[in-house]
Amino acid sequence: MSISRSRFRVRLNNADLSRMSSLLIKILILLGVAAAAVFVLFQLGSSAASFTFEFREDVIDLNILNTVRREANVGNLSDVNLEELSTRELLLTMHSHIDNANTMCNRKIRMGYTGDGGWEICDDPDVRPRVPCIIYSFGISYDFSFDDDAAKLYGCHVYSFDPSMRREKDFYDRSSHVHFYKIGLSGTTYVNQDNKWLLMTFRDIREKLGHTNTTVDIVKMDIESSEWEALPEMVASGELRRVKQLLLEYHLVDQTRDYLLPRLKAIQAVESVGFQKFYVHKNHACTVSSVFPVTRTRCYEVHYLKR
């Protein structure tokens, strides 16, 4: 007697298949969770002896950070009455404001050494130096790497200034496009009787070089605190309006009100003619201040552009 195979077939409809698939997925998930739990327990067990919680003194103090946010002026200073700020507010504003860029440069190119001595140039089409172009570089200290690179890349004539380089002639052409002058930048034109350095205003230097009615594409300044004397004259004379990019190092050596207020006013004046910060670099070679919850320095390399 033969028995038809059709009697022993299991007929599964769509609902049965769905329930079986759901059950299989749940089983796989449970197996995965169990495996993960075993792995975590193993890791904890192997490192239990060294696993401890400790207080981190370098964690940002949010109370201090909130104070900085509340009392410091980070944005543009053009509408700020600096005279009304307390000494504490001036200090917080000085460091917080300098350290925050407020415009975009899509393409920055570093000229000079990758470490100290190099500077970023904004290479965006609307501010990029184009032949014929002029660059002033104040503060060389025998390092012409920025000047040489900028001259090679853009084909600009670069005028390098430093009165402290005793081994150099008063004037010479380093190359066909890099020209050195033993002159320093200041707020007035005079000869320093202590070291016999010739110091000149930005306007007088431009007149000396025949650039009175010419736009200067880039001014780079690293002149060891003399920027605080030079900048007000550059703004007051109207000469800074003829500059497209301003790259300078701000040097801060005191925290008193009499020191901070005129320097913040100088920064305010720079911004009043349209300059905005596209890049800021903290120079860690300078002594840092512990007033802030994050690293601060006394030397800020600030890169401005004017569109």
Region annotations inferred by a language model:
Residues 2-307:
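Phosphate/nucleotide-binding beta-alpha loop and adjacent structural elements of enzyme active sites
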